[in-house]
Each structure stands twice: as structure tokens, then as C-alpha cells.
């Protein structure tokens, strides 16, 4: 799916034009209302600076939190505007509302190279309903549209899809373009062998991804809490480990599908057990056929780490989505950290394309200080999963074709 991108527009297209840019500024705040991680804001800077440098008038639209269609003072974009001003080195004005007379007056008074941030679009329930009248009001601020919010591209909302009915051209920003290049590229035309490492606690949240990846991958490694559903489906005792009883047949089907397709499906052969779910729990290493009693598995074991590392060393493209264990507890973070280090090394020394597909794996890689060493770190959680599942993202489909 080739879409028109911002890189195809130059100063002749952009100078003096009001450009509505959908960005993903849904960043975490602490109790004092301070931003604790500005990754998503920094990720939008290349697109914003390109527009500023080409003398456009930049109007940013973003959501923050889940205000449920009402104004929530704790979910205003004030701290975001302040941080963005620092990163850009220029003042960023903020409206009181994303639509209405005050917002229109501010967008109409912009000079070339100015940046304006519209207040939280989710203060209006019409945003998530993709209400076209609301979308038209948003679109009335601008002459053209750029979507750079990959993290919201799987939503058919007014600011991601509806506005494209009223603004042309509607193009992909640099972040969205990069996300599609890596994630779509890994799925559609990877350098092989292609491996996927899928972790996390529940099979249910990764069914679509696993099923889709079985059609595309040469190897799949499974870790995290979901492995115990596979073990129980095989008839093994898993002690008090997390199991989704209603997904046992599905686990059997996925193993059978892998075998039928000739995909190497690797599950851990040993695990790190704990006597309780706690950072200070008593722990021990056990083979998967020796789990019993009150013990629960919270990480993959050292033998499994080596097997996974050897399998990954043979690959040219690797997608990682989901941790290998409860990495938030240092005692049970070895599996996740080992995978992160392995991918960083393969990326640096063997020119392997390493893609970290959103969510907890990103947090794990950042916690390990290895983010800079990966080929690509996705900014989307649900959007990454849906793209890897082979789904069409509404926010992407709505853009002009290249």
C-alpha cells in the first residue's frame, strides 16, 4: 500500500499553506503533571521541522488520555506544548479547544513557520465516532493534511480518517512513513530468514499476530506467560502459572499449523519459577516437565535463552513483540534482557534488521538502554499489532495513494 508522503512535497507546495498534522502526543505524566517520557513528542519533530523549514503554517492535532468526550482539566495538552516548544526552540501556541471561534482565530492569524497545537481532540465525543461534521470543523483550520500519528492509525476517528474527506493532499508524515517501511516491509518483503519473537502474558491478545506470522515467518519464538497455555494444552503440569483455559485448543491448533507449514516454532524448554508473584519471591530453574505444586513460571530459563539466541543468529530480519517474562521484577528480567542484548548485537555487528513492535518490548529495550541500537522501534502498540496481523489501518488507507 504505497501512500503519498510528506517527502514528495517541497516549498512550492508548502510555503504559506496551513497544514493540519495529526500527531501522537499521548505521553505519560507523573502525579505532578510532568512528562516522564517524551519519546512520542520527539518522534514527531522531523515532520514538524520539515514543515517549518518549508515556510508552512503548522497546526497540530492530538489526543491525550481518555477524557470520554468531555473537557478534563488533567488531560489538557499544556505540558506537551511546553515540552514541544523546548524541543523545537520556538514558541508553540495552544488553543482552548480544537474547534470553535477562538481556535479558528488563532489558526487564521498564523504566520509562515508558526506552530499551533489544538487542544485535546478527544474532549469531543464526535472525535472517536468519526463524526463528519466535527471532522469538517477540524479540517477548516487547514489547506492540507499530514498524518504522523502511527499510534492512532488503527483508529477510524475524525482526526485520523474523517478529515481526509475535506483536505487534499492528505499525506503520510516521516514517522508514519518509517513505521510502514519497517513493519510493512518486514511482513511483505523481508530479508530472510525472518523470525518473530512473541511474548506477553496472554495468548488471547496475540492470536491474530501469531496466526498471521505463521504465514510469513521462518521461525517463531514464544515466551512470556502465554507459554503455559501451550504447555497445558500438551498435557503438562504448570503449577500455578498463568493459563487461559479457554485457549487450550487454540494453542494446539497453532502448534499444528506451524508444523504443517514447516515453520520452526520454539517454546522454552526451561523456565524460572517463583513461589509467589513478587519481586522478592523465592525462585528456581526448572525443566518444563518438572513444574508442580504452588510454583509459577515468571521467566524463560537459561537453556531456552541459548536456544533462542542460536536460532536468532541465523536470521536476517527479526520482529519482537512482548517480553519473555515479568521484566518489571529484576529477578525475572534475564530472559527479556538477554533477547534485547542479542538483538542489539545482531543489529550492530551482523546487519540484521531488528524491529521492536510496540508495547512492553519497547519499555524493556529502553530500560536496558539499548533502544538506539535497534533498527526500528515502533511507536504504536495496537497499530503495530494490527499491521503485523495484516490488517488495513484506517488512518493509512485514508491517505492519498502515491
UniProtKB/Swiss-Prot annotation:
Organism name: Prochlorococcus marinus (strain MIT 9301)
Known catalytic reactions: (2R)-3-phosphoglycerate + ATP = (2R)-3-phospho-glyceroyl phosphate + ADP
Gene Ontology, cellular component aspect: cytosol
Subunit text: Monomer.
HAMAP family: Phosphoglyc_kinase (MF_00145)
Main location: cytoplasm
Biological classification of the source: Bacteria, Bacillati, Cyanobacteriota, Cyanophyceae, Synechococcales
Pathway(s) of this molecule: Carbohydrate degradation; glycolysis; pyruvate from D-glyceraldehyde 3-phosphate: step 2/5
EC number in record: 2.7.2.3
Residues holding substrate: 24-26, 40, 63-66, 122, 155
Name under which the protein is recorded: Phosphoglycerate kinase
Location in or out of the cell: Cytoplasm
Biological process according to GO: gluconeogenesis; glycolytic process
Protein family membership: Belongs to the phosphoglycerate kinase family.
Any one GO molecular-function label of the UniProt entry: ATP binding
Keyword Cell membrane recorded: no
Pfam families per record: PGK
Keywords: ATP-binding, Cytoplasm, Glycolysis, Kinase, Nucleotide-binding, Transferase
Binding positions for ATP per the UniProt entry: 206, 297, 328, 358-361
